[in-house]
Amino acid sequence: MGKIGIFFGTDSGNAEAIAEKISKAIGNAEVIDVAKASKEQFNGFTKVILVAPTAGAGDLQTDWEDFLGTLEASDFANKTIGLVGLGDQDTYSETFAEGIFHIYEKAKAGKVVGQTPTDGYHFEASKAVEGGKFVGLVIDEDNQDDLTDERIAKWVEQVKGSFA
């Protein structure tokens, strides 16, 4: 398995903590803050995991917004991509975890892996749901932090083969 680039953007530190947990679980990964990342660095990986919190009512976190603006769909074309979104299903029930939707729109030019069921979450709507599943792993550190480690472990097992 080639080295995996785990890119995150964060305001509160939650996304960085999740990126570190995923790195520990999956192994052979480099964790990179998108606030300090370059397009060249991103393009140095063929396997990436993108960890993005949702800002406000369905927006992409600012560092991610800036970094994503430097990337084209073609930058994702030959990559295997796992998406991890953070959100608050109670406060933002109608736009839950939509931050990863904005990344997914470009990332789907590559091979996106790791879609997960919406079971166990309580929300009204989310653009991050396609075909009845989330486009990646979704974490709610505000309301279901007790499920985070289990969700990460299951997701890593699910995607490990795709990153081999």
UniProtKB/Swiss-Prot annotation:
GO terms for molecular function: FMN binding. PROSITE patterns: FLAVODOXIN_LIKE (PS50902). Its cofactor is FMN. Residues 4-160 form the Flavodoxin-like domain. Keywords: Electron transport, Flavoprotein, FMN, Transport. It holds the Pfam family Flavodoxin_1. It comes from the Bacteria. NCBIfam families: flav_long, PRK09267.1-5. Belongs to the flavodoxin family. Low-potential electron donor to a number of redox enzymes. This is Flavodoxin.
